[in-house]
Amino acid sequence: MKIPHRTTSSLTLLTVLALITSIAAACSAAEHSPGSTSATTTRPASPFDPTEKPPSPIGLLLAYRAIDEIGLVDGTNVVASVSGTFGSSNDLITTEDGKFVFARTTDNKIATLDVESGKGATREVPVGPTLGTGGAGTIMWLEQPNRLMQLDLADPDSQPVLHQTVDLPPAAGGHLREPRLVAARGGTAVIARVEAPPSPFGGPDTLYAVRGPAAPTPLGQADANSPVSVARLSPDGAELTYALYRSTDSSCGTAAVVLSGADGTQQTFEVAGPDADRGSRVPKLWWPVTGPPKLSLVTWRCDRPETSSPLVWQLAGETSDTIEEVSPPTSALQTIDVAPGQRALILPETGGYAEPTGTLVLEESTRRISIKSGVDAIAAIRPSP
């Protein structure tokens, strides 16, 4: 099923970047049968030190974050890992140069894994609640009240340095809340702040794009009464996609997906179905180095706690002007194409969406091989030439 979009005029991220440039020069597991849906537009850890060097990569590697470790997979084998306790999020887990896997521990430290050596460590560096990337082997976070901080993972002795001070414009009404980093990638950081009278559900957010020394540029107010927490920038930082969740009460709400595109418009895809008694949510968004952004979508009946299996969708078309289920229809929290005929998937532990973690499996034809349980995020790493 393809869904057209609702188009409205807005200042898009690409337009913002152009403006700023001018100013500042991812054993067998059971298969799940995908359901159907309809949509309409608009862990401190001891450092991991292997006794011998991991096998040389034979192809694309998979990085993963689980509740108890971050790791690397070659084929179906975990070849390196770092123990820790990790919460689920939509944060990136690999640096832009593909040389490090990283994640924030629940006690606010940073676990890292060197892809080439297989060595890992836990850095005694307090980081912010949301991590992004800042180019090459650096990571980035927001330190209150207005400091974008950066850490170079390639230097084991590095300390956080100030990347940029972000002075958001004043807002009327006295309802300001602390800003939050929503995403950072490709030289762009997106920051959210509640500026209007907040709803009981925490929103709405006003979004800003930050790139270079120029002043942040507003991207507008999110059309939702809940905070924006699931978002992803394109690899070059030129486009942004994020999920909306419009709460109707504590147990229900509906989802939409927004893309700030390259054509001067903002596209909103209303992925909620027409049934007012059904809720929907986007728990995960990812944007591969190549290809369109993808997302997992879950639905449920508002009068029942059970949810359906998450289904994978993607933005499609030459200008990402439609949204559709991937082919073949896939029930998973996240997917990555590994090789022709092979995919890595995070499958829910149960048939429905009960928690944001699942089992990482490698799928080849009709066979699925389990690799690791309790996984909530994966990313592809291509070996350096």
Describe the predicted segments one by one.
Residues K2-L14:
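Bacterial N-terminal signal peptides that target proteins for export
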Residues I23-A26:
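C-terminal motif of bacterial Sec signal peptides marking the signal peptidase cleavage site
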Residues S28-E31:
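Bacterial signal peptide processing site
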Residues A39-S83:
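An edge-strand/N-cap motif at the start of beta-rich repeat modules
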Residues P47-E52, F86-G98, V125-T138, P169-R185, ...:
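Repeated scaffold domains used in trafficking and secretory/extracellular systems
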Residues E52-A66, D91-T94, G98-T105, G135-Q144, ...:
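Short beta-strand elements that form the blades of beta-propeller/WD-repeat-like
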Residues A66-F86, R104-V125, N146-A172, S199-A222, ...:
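Surface-exposed loop/turn elements that mediate protein-protein interactions on large endomembrane-trafficking
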Residues R278-G317, V326-P348:
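Loop/turn-rich, solvent-exposed surfaces of beta-rich toroidal or solenoidal domains
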